[in-house]
Each structure stands twice: as C-alpha cells, then as structure tokens.
A protein has these predicted regions:
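Catalytic cores of nucleotide-sugar-dependent glycosyltransferases that transfer UDP/GDP/TDP-activated
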Residues: 1-299
Length: 299
C-alpha cells in the first residue's frame, strides 16, 4: 500500500478520508479542464466541492489549464456532413435554406423561410436550462418564430415541452429521444441553436452551430462564455460577434436575449455578417491539439 506518511492535508487526505481525485490533482505535473472559463470556475466553492483551495493553488502555479474541446470536421462540417440532404459552405449558402425547409417539413411546421427557426438538441435537464426555455418559449411564438426540440430526460421536462408543442402546433415541435441524423439536420437547418445551460464545462453544440452558421444563443458560463461573442452594435461593427449571450439564469434574461435575436433577424445584412464571422471561427481539433502539445512540451 501507500506509505502512511502520505495521509495528510498536503497529500491524500480530504476531510479525514482518502481522496483519489485530490491525490491525482495534487501529485500531477499538470491538469486540464475543457475550457479556460471552467478552469476558473472550478477554483470557486460553487464548483469545487471542497477542492477550491487546491485548485486555486494549481491555477496560480500554472498547473491547471483550460483547453477547449474541438470539432471533428470530418463529421461536423456542412460541406461534407453525410446526414444532411443539402451541403453548403461559407461562399455558397443555398443549401442551408434548403435544409431549413426540410427540417420544417420533418416537424410539420410551416415551410416559411422568413420565420426565425430556433433549434435545441439536448438532454432535458435543469442543468441544460430547459425550464428557462419552457417559461420563455411564448416569446418565440409571439414574434412569429419557430422552435424545434430534440432530446430526452426528466419526465416533467419532457411533459413540459410536449405541452408547448400541443399549445402552439404552428410554431413549436418536439421529438422525445435521440436521432443522430435529425440532430445534424437541426444544426444545419436552424437559424439559432439554443444552449441556455446553468453550467457547461465546454459544450459542443454551440461549436457545431458556429460551424454551420446557426448562431448560438447561450448563457455566459464555462465553455459557452469562451466560444460565443454576443452580438452588440460594437461587436458586429468590429466583426467579432458570433451569436447571442445572456448572463442571469432566469426566464426574463433568456426572453430578452430571444428578443435581441429577433431584432437582428430583421436586419438581413447584419445577420449575414454575424453568420459569416461565426462560420470563420476555428474550433478544430488542430487548434486544440496545438495547445495540448504546447502544454506537454513545457512539463
């Protein structure tokens, strides 16, 4: 076994017991989290579950590093995606409109090109902010938009979104479960992809949205905060805007963000600019791999 001398606060011990998680962190040369913001968040009591002192120390020493996940462009790219009926790319976007029509037809919603189409592919849990969407989805209906949801999870959330679809059959549709091909079509055919998570270490859905020109609407947390730049007049002018971001985990904050998305939708040229800038972002594994190599080379 391990030497008894290792069982102390500067070793294996955590609250009188052996913690293998703490031990691994303590004795490692470096640890990685899946985004820079999450690496900061886990140094706080809210996220660290008693390890905030250790994690804060590691962060200060440069031994805790946040590196974002990457997107596999052989699977998730609108010009090669095997699951979508119409391929497209940045300089030729006609396929995106066709995918939108296919998606609307699949969900039996009006095939209206002018309707702002929101999509959400997720586990139906509180962490994913599903309750926030249920309480603010009427804003999408009020403004003539569409909402399509794919996912499964907590029974009361499944029931909640079913009730939304029953109440607004011309605007909201849902499929309970998971369907790989449909998830790709939703990312390709939507205009906005919703990721209103309460916490999100990295998140991949918003990265797929950027890749496909489906603007992410996200809460400012974890990897979502690192990957999506809010569309303000300043950021749009600076060509840095890539989506929509809200801060408070409340239905009111999400509702206001939805309103801002509709406002931008009414400005086609500005929308196209943001979409272009979103699609030009590089969140490939090439970029992530280079960051890992840089870290490993300095150990």
């Amino acid at each position: 076994g391990l030497p008894t001398g290792m069982f102390h606060v500067e070793g294996l011990e955590l609250v009188g017991q052996i913690s293998y998680l703490k031990s691994g962190l303590f004795y490692s040369d470096a640890s990685t989290a899946v985004s820079p913001t999450y690496a900061e968040e886990i140094t706080t009591p809210e996220f660290a579950y008693g390890l905030q002192g250790l994690l804060s120390g590691l962060k200060a020493q440069g031994r805790l590093v946040g590196i974002l996940n990457g997107v596999d462009e052989n699977i998730w790219h609108p010009n090669v995606d095997q699951y979508i009926p119409h391929h497209y790319k940045l300089k030729y976007m006609a396929g995106k409109k066709k995918n939108k029509a296919e998606l609307q037809a699949y969900f039996n919603l009006p095939q209206d090109e002018s309707a702002l189409a929101f999509v959400m592919v997720t586990r139906l849990t509180e962490q994913k902010g599903v309750d926030l969407l249920i309480e603010s989805a009427d804003e999408i209906v009020k403004q003539g938009g569409q909402l399509m949801i794919l996912g499964s999870g907590a029974p009361h959330f499944e029931q909640g979104i079913r009730e939304l679809a029953e109440r607004y059959p011309q605007n909201i549709a849902v499929k309970i479960g998971y369907d790989e091909a449909l998830s790709h079509l939703m990312v390709a055919g939507g205009d906005v992809i919703l990721v209103p998570s309460r916490f999100e270490p990295c998140g991949l859905t918003q990265l797929y949205g950027l890749q496909y020109g489906t603007l992410p609407l996200v809460r400012k947390t974890g990897g979502l905060a690192d990957t999506v730049v809010d569309s303000t007049s300043e950021s749009i002018k600076a060509r840095t805007a890539t989506g929509f971001v809200f801060e408070s985990a409340t239905p009111e904050a999400l509702r206001h963000c939805l309103q801002r998305a509709f406002a931008l939708w009414q400005k086609p040229r500005a929308w196209a600019m943001v979409r272009t800038d979103a699609m030009e972002q590089d969140f490939s594994w090439r970029k992530a791999a280079e960051q890992y190599r840089t870290l490993y080379e300095r150990l």
